[in-house]
Amino acid sequence: MAQTTNPQESLWGVDSSPAIKSYTLSNLRKIPQIEKFSEEQIFEMEVVAQVLPFKANNYVIEQLIDWDNVPGDSMFNLTFPQKHMLKSEHYDMMASVLKNNPAPKEIKDMADKIRLELNPHPAGQMELNVPILKDGTKLYGMQHKYKETTLFFPSQGQTCHAYCSFCFRWPQFVGMDEMKFAM
């Protein structure tokens, strides 16, 4: 456990637990543990989170991350945006925009420009990996890359309780409909 070593001290349990609270870019600075970070470290997270989706919840933050071991904690690295997740030129482009007190549209335009260069669907998977029935009907919202695996992307399931920082499904979460695999 991250915050407590004695499970009996935890507020989280089978019979009772606090309400789930989500954290995204919009309230990243309200995460109590973030106060320990320098302004530069927080800015780095915000730069990356403008391009790649960030979402965590209070259970992950309170129970799964060992804040005494950050940045070495695996759950922290899996959940929180890291500067190296973007190419240096992409990071610099977004950081430059953010430093100039931009309008929301400027931020979105730069984020979308960078996202389009990230190749979220390599090898033609938007066309080539869509399953096809015997009658030729394409099953959009599904992906069949490997013989034993089919991925299903229902429209109503396009979210997670927390976004993993290296998830290949990030196009499902950033509001660029042409990049979604959803049904």
Regions found by a protein language model. Give the residues of each.
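Canonical Radical SAM [4Fe-4S] cluster-binding loop centered on the CxxxCxxC motif
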Residues: 144-182
